[in-house]
């Protein structure tokens, strides 16, 4: 991915039912009309099974021509489990990964063999050399667990110094936050592509909950506007307009 090129990717959640998989398959094929660099597939938190991710990736790989990029998280996992997942992805012909630390669910015990994303990145490169193309995550508004924005930025740039393609950000709704983040990264010599992550607005309660959990700050103007809508269809319509404007900017 060229730094200044304009590309799209779409992120999917693994469905929990066969009918959900069929519906996702239809959606993904429709999305191929908008050429995407890749489709990414998320996974469960805290080292939970990644079988759903693999099943979804396999379906999309067979049904579409778009490259598929499974998310893989190190938190709560040991080397054997991660290696098993990586070999399964390689056997399927998948070459792109989104590598994350991941979040521990409440009450989870062991952090596993990979306390940070950079540990997992190093492990993947040691085991598979340059077979996988790696994207990483980033928090333009600072990771909720970070000691300070400065330390968070330092650790992010350390992660980007590895043999990775670039990064995808956590969602945000203030474009100035993203542009400032890019500027701060470049001051530290971190110049690989950082793709903005944009989440559709379809439900007010879900948006507020996810923003709180992820440390994403919602602009007051957005909150005020959302408060004027009581019907979900109206929220969705406004969300499409708002996010479309954000993407254009």
Question: Residue ranges of each PLM-predicted region?
Answer:
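Active-site mouth loops of central-metabolism enzymes
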Residues: 7-23, 68-80, 133-151, 227-241
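Catalytic cores of alpha/beta
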Residues: 77-90, 151-155, 179-183, 203-209, ...
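Hydrophobic faces of well-ordered beta-strands that scaffold small-molecule active sites
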Residues: 6-14, 39-41, 68-72, 97-99, ...
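Active-site pocket-lining/capping segments in soluble small-molecule metabolic enzymes
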Residues: 19, 112-139, 188-248
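Active-site-proximal loop/turn and secondary-structure-junction residues that shape catalytic pockets
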Residues: 12-16, 43-47, 74-76, 101-105, ...
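Active-site glycine-rich loop that binds ribose-phosphate moieties when present
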Residues: 145-164, 177
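Active-site-adjacent beta->alpha loops and helix N-cap segments on the catalytic face
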Residues: 19-21, 47-60, 78-84, 103-125, ...
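Conserved N-terminal beta1-alpha1 strand-loop-helix module at the mouth
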Residues: 1-41
